[in-house]
Curated annotation (Swiss-Prot):
It is an enzyme of class 6 (ligase). This is D-alanine--D-alanine ligase. Pathway: Cell wall biogenesis; peptidoglycan biosynthesis. The lineage of its organism: Bacteria, Bacillati, Bacillota, Bacilli, Lactobacillales. One of its GO terms (cellular component) is cytosol.
Length: 377
């Protein structure tokens, strides 16, 4: 049997560029370990250019990226906008894309739009699922209208933020809030505020990353939970994992970018999470419901906050969860009796299945006729 040809694409121009490389290394190894696929790699440099497979392999091996990218840029016509993706021609006729681009481009639907334009199967959620889930405000609104419990919130832009007072925030949401850029991942552009000065500083920081900012009520004494979901029409959930960041003396600690990807030595992990059976069932049910409501496919991680009364709140989905050695998503499936090799095989199968299903849809062209649209001269 001819092996399917997988194009693993990683990197990107977001703050999660280096995280993507570490995730891609694990996916690359797992794909090879299946023995079922040929594989090539494409790195997206921080300037947004897709690099050829030879240079991309060197970047995946963690060589210094700067001279590799500088050398590649001497080979392209930078006046041609299509030169940004021209390297995709180098791999020949591969069968499926496997995106491992966290943050911008990879999780906001941009790459998925390109894959659809190229008429190629790809692993993961469709464009609309990524785009909606990456926008924290749209996600909250969809969760709310579908009665999926989440925290209270306020949305502001730069104009409305000028008239919003800290007193009003405290009245509506409480005296501790989280301020988040609407379209960012991995806790980038996220701050906790418990005073007026901290709130103003948090807004300033978040507006560096987006024109729309979400202000969320904090959950008191929370336990942070994560659950993995994979599949298409009939998704399955992993065991639930919990993590706890010890208090540093300034209030409730939280799972920030540094804890996730730089140094998690102080983080206490618990897999599976020690929860009452009813809470376990509710969290898994909420995760599955959100997965379907947000039109997700392939894979996702659902993040929850559990308050001091064991009431779960869905925080946000992650449509392309990290797969580094520090990532809880990766470990959740190990504890769910699905190892890395089986997991990537399933994800690739889901990608092909979704493509084949969508290929059955009708996109009928109906001509208006020359008398309606005229002739081109």
């Amino acid at each position: 049997m001819t092996k399917k040809y997988v194009a693993l694409i990683f990197g990107g121009n977001s703050s999660e560029h280096d995280v993507s490389k570490r995730s891609a290394q694990n996916f690359y190894d797992a794909i090879l370990a299946t023995g079922k696929y040929r594989i090539t790699v494409f790195a997206i440099a921080q300037n947004g250019y897709v690099l050829d497979p030879e240079r991309s392999k060197r970047i995946l091996a963690l060589e210094d990226e700067r001279p590799i990218v500088a050398d590649y840029m001497t080979t392209v016509d930078q006046q041609d906008p299509l030169s940004r993706i021209n390297a995709l021609r180098a791999a020949g006729d591969f069968d499926i894309f496997f995106p491992v681009v966290h943050g911008n481009l990879g999780e906001d639907g941009t790459l998925q739009g390109l894959f659809k334009l190229l008429n190629k199967p790809y692993v993961g959620a469709p464009l609309r699922g990524h785009a909606v889930s990456f926008d924290k405000v749209l996600t909250k609104e969809l969760l709310t209208v579908n009665n999926i419990r989440n925290t209270k919130y306020i949305v502001v832009d730069e104009k409305t933020a000028k008239t919003l007072t800290w007193a009003q925030v405290v009245k509506d949401l409480g005296d501790v809030v989280f301020v988040k850029a609407a379209n960012q991942g991995s806790s980038v552009g996220v701050s906790r505020a418990k005073t007026a000065d901290e709130f103003e500083a948090a807004l300033t920081d978040s507006f560096q990353y987006d024109y729309k900012v979400l202000i969320e009520a904090a959950v008191k004494g929370p336990r942070e939970l994560e659950v993995g979901v994979i599949g298409n029409e009939d998704p399955i959930v992993s065991e639930i994992g919990a993590h706890h960041v010890p208090n540093q003396g300034d209030g409730d600690a939280w799972y920030d970018y540094n804890n996730k990807f730089v140094d998690n030595s102080s983080v206490q992990f618990e897999i599976p999470a020690n929860l009452p059976d009813a809470v376990t069932a509710e969290v898994k049910d909420m995760a599955l419901k959100a997965y379907k409501v947000l039109d997700l496919r392939g894979e996702a991680r659902m993040d929850f906050l559990l308050d001091e009364n064991n009431v779960p709140y869905l925080g946000e989905p992650n449509t392309l969860p990290g797969f580094t050695n520090m990532s809880l998503f990766k470990r959740l499936w190990d504890y769910s009796d699905i190892d890395n090799v089986e997991l990537v095989d399933k994800l690739i199968d889901y990608g092909f299945a979704e493509f084949e299903k969508n290929a059955q849809l009708s996109y009928e062209f109906v001509s208006l006729g020359e008398e309606k649209i005229g002739k081109f001269n």
